[in-house]
Curated annotation (Swiss-Prot):
Cellular component, GO annotation: cytosolic large ribosomal subunit
An example Gene Ontology molecular-function term: structural constituent of ribosome
UniProt record, GO biological process: translation
Disulfide bonds: none
Species, as recorded: Bradyrhizobium diazoefficiens (strain JCM 10833 / BCRC 13528 / IAM 13628 / NBRC 14792 / USDA 110)
Assembly information from the UniProt record: Part of the 50S ribosomal subunit. Contacts protein L32.
Family from the record: Belongs to the bacterial ribosomal protein bL17 family.
Tagged with keyword Ribonucleoprotein: yes
UniProt keyword annotations, A-Z: Ribonucleoprotein, Ribosomal protein
Name of the protein in question: Large ribosomal subunit protein bL17
Amino acid sequence: MRHGKVHRKLNRTAEHRRAMFANMAAALIKHEQIVTTLPKAKELRPIVEKLVTLGKKGGLAMRRQAISEMRDKDQVKKLFDVLATRYKDRQGGYTRIIKAGFRYGDNAAMAVIEFVDRDVDAKGQDSGPVQEKEAEAA
């Protein structure tokens, strides 16, 4: 029986889900808006909300807890420095999910998950490894 089982399995092992949501949370904090499937967005929302609450609490123990959940120190720094100050007066509800139609290949329901009052310029910034240094050296 499924009594008390509230989370979706998403056809993945527990380790895969944990790693996937850690990566998705880091991507959402980095870009402040990501496009994913609707069930993944609905599962990601409480994870990110709890991370923002950790950032608002501040302190070394909360920072270490966020690092253990997200495994990306740069995004934890942004979480504690930028997002915590942005949402210091908001009591929850830091993210929104907007339905975005259906994916062409498999007709999966897609959604945009983004931060409320997000920085529009953050989207697409600092994506991937820097390749300008290699071009300057050549």
